Amino acid sequence: MLVFIDLDGTLTNTTHPGWRPYRDGQEDVDVNMVPVFQGAKEFIQECYNRGIHVVLVSDSHPRYVEPIRAMLGLQGIFLADKPNTQRLDEYIAVSPILQQELTHPENCYFIGDTKLDIEIGRKMRIRTILLQLYSVPDSDVDVHSGVGDRMGNLKMGPTYCAFSFTDVLQIFDDPDRKLYARESRIIGQESTNVIRFWEHSYSYDTKTAILCLARQEEGLCDSFARSDKYREISNPNRAPEFLDLLAGTLSSYLHFFESTCPPSIRWTHLTYLSDKSSTKPPEKMKQIFDRIQSGIPKAKLLTWLERNQGSLRNQVDYQSRRQFLVDFLRVDDGVDLRGANIIVIDDQLTTGATAHYVIKQFRDRGAKNVFFIAFFQMIMEVGDAVICPQCGQKMKIRRRARDGKRFYSCVPPQFGGQGCGNIINID
C-alpha cells in the first residue's frame, strides 16, 4: 500500500496565518513548538508497522518541512507545487517502489485537508481522504487553497471523509465498505456512508441537511465515482433492474438513517422533486420513488407549474437556478406541514440551489426537520491537460449518454466551449 500525505492541516495544526513566515522559509522553525495533531505520530508508526509506504507531500519551504519530517519520523518526502503533478510525476518516475505500488491504484491513497490535496489524488486516479481535524474562523477561510472551506473541499469530490486518524485506519481496513452508499452498492458491497454536503442544527432534535449517496465525476478521478450511473437515470431504455438497485440503495440508507435519529423525531413525509411534463424519460423520478421501501409515509408535495419554460439543468449558476425555482416550483397548499419532518429525494446535486430552496420552502410552511437526499453529487471537474491535435485547445473528458463510454472532447461553442468539436475515444 502507498500513502501520500499532506503536512499543514493534516499532520500539524499549522494553517493559521501566523505560521506563514515559517511555512515560507523566512524563519527557522522550532519543532518543539509545532502543534502536531493528536494521533498523527501514532498513525505514521502504524502505517510503517503495516508495511505501508508513506510519502510526505508538502508545498511549504524545505527549511520548514525537513525538520518537521524528521521530528515526525517520516521517511519519504516530496515538495510539490499543488495542485500541479508534474514534479510529483518526475519524483515517482525515479522510484521503482512507487511505480510498482501505483500499478494498483486501488491500494493507493492521498490524504489531505484541502481541495488541492484531493485534486492531486484525483489526477493520480487514486483514492483520496479529506481529513478534517480543525476549524477556522470565517476570516481565515481560504477559498483558493481550501483551508477551512468545508463545502469547497467536498465539491472537489474526495473518495472518503475522515475526522480522526482512527477513521483513516478504519478506511484502510475495509475500503470498499467505507465508500459512499451508492458507490459501495455498485461494486457489490454495503455502506451507510453519505456525503454530508451541508448541515444546520437549530436544536437537539431540529435540523436541516443536504446529503448525497455518490459522486458524479467530471474528468479525472478514482474509479468509484460513476457519472455513467447518473446518466443512466435519464436513459429512455434504462432497465428495471437498474431502478431497483438505485431505489434499494436509498431504502437501505433510510432504514439506517431512521435508526440513528433521536426518538423524538417521527418522519412524517417522504417526497421527491417531481418530474415536469417535459421530463425525459417520462416519470423519471416517480418510477424510482415508487420502488423505495420505507415506513415513512409517501406524498407528492412538490409540483412544477405547467407554464414553466426551459429547464433547471440549463440554468448555469446558483442565482439563475434559484430564480427558476422561485418562478416555477410550488409546495402543495393543501397539506398542513406545521411540525412536519420531511425527507426530499432528488437525482442530482449541482450548485445546491434546488436543495436550499426546497428546504426553505418547507421550513417557511412550518416544517421542523427537512433532509434533502440526492443520489449523486456533481463534483468539480479535474482536467487531463490533453491538447486537441486539430486546433490546440484543451480537451475535456466526457461520457456518451448512450453507452457511458469516456472520450476526450474539444468542446465546440454550441456546448459552451471554444473548441472545434474533435473527439478522441478513451474507452
Where are these regions (language model features)?
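Short metal-binding segments enriched for Cys and/or His
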Residues: P413-D427
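Short cysteine-rich clusters marking metal-coordination/redox-active sites
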Residues: C388-C391, C410
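Short, acidic loop-to-helix structural element flanking the phosphoryl-transfer center
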Residues: D28-V55, E66, Q86-D89, T260-H269, ...
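Acidic, Mg2+-coordinating phosphoryl-transfer loop and its flanking beta/alpha structural elements
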Residues: F110-G157
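PRPP/pyrophosphate-binding module of the type I phosphoribosyltransferase fold
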Residues: P105, E119, K123-S135, Q309-I387
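Active-site-facing substrate-recognition patch
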Residues: D174-I265, E306-G334
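Active-site neighborhood of HAD-like aspartate-dependent phosphohydrolases
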Residues: M1-Q45, N49
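Substrate-recognition "cap/lid" segment bordering the active-site pocket of phosphatases
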Residues: P62-Y109, K115
